[in-house]
Regions:
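Short acidic-hydrophobic sequence patches enriched in Asp/Glu that either
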Residues: 9, 87-90, 163
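Juxtamembrane extracytoplasmic/periplasmic/luminal helical "stalk" adjacent to the first N-terminal
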Residues: 1-49, 65-67
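Short, solvent-exposed secondary-structure junction/capping segments
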Residues: 40-43, 77-78, 168-169
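Solvent-exposed, extracytoplasmic
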Residues: 49-66, 97, 136, 140-174
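Amphipathic alpha-helical segments in well-structured domains
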Residues: 10, 55, 91-95
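Extracytoplasmic/periplasmic ligand-binding sensor regions of membrane-associated signaling proteins
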Residues: 63-64, 70, 75-153
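Conserved beta-strand cores of small sensory beta-sandwich domains that regulate signal transduction
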Residues: 36, 69-71, 160-162
Length: 174
């Protein structure tokens, strides 16, 4: 009896883990694919296109795909917002990594610079023209969206879920 119950619990926990992993991975992969599809368009990678033109297009796309924001960053690592001065993101580790390696970056959760309160995960993708990095696009995924994935998966199976960050820290738990 006890061995059977243990095996059932083990299977339920494994199924919940697979479910959470698939859902979180799907959201990140979806974000990477969206950014990649935009990054190959000259209207985004070409530095001769004014930054605010890029931002206006991104603002329309943001709401459609359910992100906090999708932003343009220029080659000087400044992020642009309509109606505001460009803000430097050069001190952000993920931006330094992206601009030095040319590889997409996915962050752990952090408080968004826009308000300093909203927790989010960021997916950033480089913009390149003739092999040179001309900037990047990034999108922010609400922390609560990821937490809800954990809650739904753990509530369904009656298990607990913990999201571990890239440095082994607990990002969220149910």
């Amino acid at each position: 009896g006890l061995a059977i119950a243990f095996q059932r619990m083990k299977k339920e926990a494994a199924a919940a883990h697979e479910n959470v992993t698939a859902q979180v991975s799907n959201r990140v992969e979806e974000s990477l694919k969206l950014l990649e599809s935009m990054a190959i368009q000259p209207e985004f990678y070409d530095p001769s296109v004014p930054p605010l033109e890029k931002v206006a297009k991104l603002d329309r796309i943001t709401e459609t795909y359910g992100y906090i924001m999708i932003c343009f960053v220029d080659s000087d690592i400044n992020v642009y917002t309509i109606g505001e001065e460009p803000a430097s993101l050069a001190s952000r580790e993920y931006m330094q990594q992206l601009f030095s390696t040319g590889q997409p970056q996915i962050t752990d959760s952090f408080a968004a610079g826009a308000d300093g309160i909203t927790l989010n995960y960021t997916v950033a993708y480089p913009l390149k023209q003739n092999g040179e990095i001309t900037g990047c696009l990034f999108c922010a995924i609400y922390f609560d969206e990821i937490v809800n994935i954990l809650k739904e998966a753990s509530g369904f199976s009656g298990t607990q879920a913990v999201l571990i960050g890239s440095r082994g820290q607990i990002m969220s738990s149910t």
